[in-house]
Every structure is written in C-alpha cells, then in structure tokens.
Amino acid sequence: MLLPRQFYARDVLIVAKDLLNCYLVREYNGHLLIGKIVETEAYHQNDPACHAYRGKTKRNEVMFGPPGHAYVYFTYGMHYCFNVVTGAIGRAEAVLIRALEPVKGIDIIKTLRGGKSERELLSGPAKLTQGLAIDLKLNGHDLTGGKILYITKGEPVAEEDIVVTTRIGINAGKDLPYRFYLKNNKYVSKK
C-alpha cells in the first residue's frame, strides 16, 4: 500500500521511526528498484544541523512543505542525499533515508553502483541515491503519486527492534538522538 500524505503530515521524529521497514520504490528504465528502509535520521527547523535552521532558501524550500515530497540535495560536490518532507506546511522538517536493504532489481542496482557487494549497495545516503538513480531531477517529487519514486507500507516494527542513537557526519546537533535503525540489520550504514 502506498503511503498517503497524512502519514507524512506528522512530527518528523515519529515519521522517521515509522518509515523503518517500509519500501522505497524507484521506477527506472522500465524496472522496479526496491529497497527496505533500515536506517533514518530526523531533521527539523529548530535543529542546528537542519538545512532550514537559518530560514527558507532556494535550496531548502521543498522542506517547508507540503509533506510527502522528496527533498534531494547535492553535497560535498559529488553526492546526492534523499529526504522525505514531513510535518505541517511551513514547519520545515525532513527525514534523511540513510540506508536500504536491497529487495528487487538488485542486478540493476549493482550496475548503477559499479558492481559493489550486496551489503555495500545501499548502505549509506550517497550509496542509495546512486543505486536507485536519484538525483536533483527528483527534488520536490510527490511521493504520494505512486509513480517514478514512492514509498509503500511495510510491517510495523516493535520498539525493542529499533535502535535510537545520535546522527552521523554532523557537528551541530550531533548529540541529539535523532537517528533510528533496525537492530541486527546488516545493511545499516554504521552501528
């Protein structure tokens, strides 16, 4: 089942946890590339690590809503990162999808990733955007439309199977427990 807009129109910390075990689906050249979401990070406007912390810009305007859209950005001059916009319109919240477990289209994902091992295919934000061919053309894409790029419902995850910890690769807000991942999943980027 496709996740509806109201799923995303909730607090970023709730959505970040609830996205675990859901499926990110990418339609690519007539094929479906699917990964199970196994790791996320939450960012909100009052968070110093958030792109919207200092207000709205051309780069981050998608974060201000509506919820259920893709926020894709280019970083370090070489990588893309994929986020899901959450919360109320104007609130600037997003969930960074950090890692996926490959489910379908693995041969195509391997080609896009240059033949990496299955464990390394989608186990990081830049790896998953490369493996699913996600770039700036998908920034602002409506994930509730059920075409090109979307998320479908997965099985609920018990609280005891979710690890809550601090985020990776940031300086500001690095002590906030806004990173979530599935316990014992080998596709998580870093434990």
Swiss-Prot record:
Listed EC numbers: 3.2.2.-
Keywords from the UniProt entry: DNA damage, DNA repair, Hydrolase
NCBIfam families registered for this protein in UniProt: 3mg, PRK00802.1-3
InterPro entries registered for this protein in UniProt: Formyl_transferase-like_C_sf, MPG, MPG_sf
Enzyme class name: hydrolase
GO biological process, one term: base-excision repair
Source organism, top-level taxon: Bacteria
GO molecular function terms attached to this record: alkylbase DNA N-glycosylase activity; DNA binding
Family the entry assigns: Belongs to the DNA glycosylase MPG family.
Protein name: Putative 3-methyladenine DNA glycosylase
Transmembrane segments: none
Gene3D superfamilies: Methylpurine-DNA glycosylase (MPG) (3.10.300.10)
